[in-house]
Amino acid sequence: MAQKKGGGSTRNGRDSQPKMLGVKKFGGEVINAGSIIVRQRGTKFHPGVNVGIGKDHTLFALVDGAVSFSVKGALNKHTVNVTPA
């Protein structure tokens, strides 16, 4: 007979796929229209001039140009802008 009991099942053993969030293009970088600048959950970064926002809060460039980040107001609102090249 076996000297050990059979191993029971476990409730662990699963994990979600990585979502690849974060800043994709940094301040001063030159980008093309449609390029993703920030992938995020919620609006940690808000769209500014020449920046659009997707339904999953992804920020993307509306024109070709250079990326710039700014912090404004008493609430330290982070805004992303694209200056046309």
Curated annotation (Swiss-Prot):
Source superkingdom: Bacteria
GO BP term (any one): translation
Signal peptide: none
Region of interest (Disordered), residue spans: 1-21
Coiled-coil portions: none
Ranges of Gly residues composition bias in the record: 1-10
A single Gene Ontology CC term: cytosolic large ribosomal subunit
A Pfam family per the record: Ribosomal_L27
Family per similarity comment: Belongs to the bacterial ribosomal protein bL27 family.
Protein name: Large ribosomal subunit protein bL27
Source organism (scientific name): Polaromonas sp. (strain JS666 / ATCC BAA-500)
